[in-house]
UniProtKB/Swiss-Prot annotation:
It comes from Mus musculus. The keyword Acetylation applies. The modification Phosphoserine is found at S4, S16, S25, S31, S38, S63. This is Stathmin. The modification N-acetylalanine is found at A2. Residues 41-140 form a coiled coil. The modification N6-methyllysine is found at K29.
Amino acid sequence: MASSDIQVKELEKRASGQAFELILSPRSKESVPDFPLSPPKKKDLSLEEIQKKLEAAEERRKSHEAEVLKQLAEKREHEKEVLQKAIEENNNFSKMAEEKLTHKMEANKENREAQMAAKLERLREKDKHVEEVRKNKESKDPADETEAD
């Protein structure tokens, strides 16, 4: 574009800046456009070239399909590994919970048995004491009766 194609008109001047209006003159018929209006014509392709392009396209399709299948297989394998790991962790958790519960139940059983043994021992001590008191009383009673007579 030549400088004669553009006109600059000042609109207003402010402290924040200036405003301009640019007026572009219409293009002349003689000027050559910067870009071609139609795409360049393609050369005619031979049957061999067409066949090669079709084979290359088929090869690309097969390669893409193989890549997609490979990715799917990898994804399935990963899913299997994740599932196996989850099952293993679940089993480990179950075993640990079962062992913990068994240990707790054994501790409770031992505690209960110890408490029962302690109660039985106290009862035996009480029976022994009662028997001693009875013997002492019986041994004193006949003596008291003879003295009183």
